[in-house]
Amino acid sequence: MQKQVVVMDEAAIKRALTRVSYEIIERNKGTKNLALVGIKTRGIYLAERLHKRILEIEGIDVPVGDIDITLYRDDLSFKDDKTREPAVHGTNIPFDINGKKVVLVDDVLYTGRTVRAAMDALMDVGRPAQIHLAVLADRGHRELPIRADYVGKNIPTSGNERVEVRLTDVDNEEDAVIINKNE
């Protein structure tokens, strides 16, 4: 039997993203040379929301892009097992990342493997001056030495729990962060 527990509702997500936006601005001493890159899929929408908040706070339009890490994963999945073709969605970074302070944005930080793949993919696009990581939820259980610079909420979990982020933009459901517990 699976039990769902909502740990962040729409209002909590909005507050967390506002706080993270302020933290990004403060840590980078403004928005000069700053860029946001969302990791597909939900990281893209969270990066857009951070972009909107930073624009409201600073009045500066920080560049936003998105990155597809499919070919960089160590657990590559295929859209068709017969042809062994990976399901690639494409990267869209319409600005030069060389010398920029890039904030990678994702929904959940777990093992660190997604972030490692995103950094590899980003380095193939250019050479940023810095790479920071912003996540909505950090659930622990790292397998790689990766730590988020900006965290919406730390959510300690056990091995039989899964953290799921639902966003209106993608899931057509109310924004929420949910822990699914197998009992």
Curated annotation (Swiss-Prot):
Annotated PANTHER family: BIFUNCTIONAL PROTEIN PYRR (PTHR11608:SF0)
Top-level EC class as recorded in UniProt: transferase
GO biological process: DNA-templated transcription termination
Similarity comment text for this entry: Belongs to the purine/pyrimidine phosphoribosyltransferase family. PyrR subfamily.
Protein name (record): Bifunctional protein PyrR
Keywords assigned by UniProt, alphabetized: Glycosyltransferase, RNA-binding, Transcription, Transcription regulation, Transcription termination, Transferase
Annotated TM spans: none
Gene3D superfamilies: 3.40.50.2020
Sites where the protein binds substrate: T41, R42, D106, D107, V108, L109, Y110, T111, G112, R113, T114, R139, V163
NCBIfam families for this protein: PRK05205.1-1 (NF003545), PRK05205.1-4 (NF003548), PRK05205.1-5 (NF003549)
Matching HAMAP family: PyrR
Organism taxonomic ancestry: Bacteria, Bacillati, Bacillota, Bacilli, Bacillales
Natural source organism: Listeria monocytogenes serotype 4b (strain F2365)
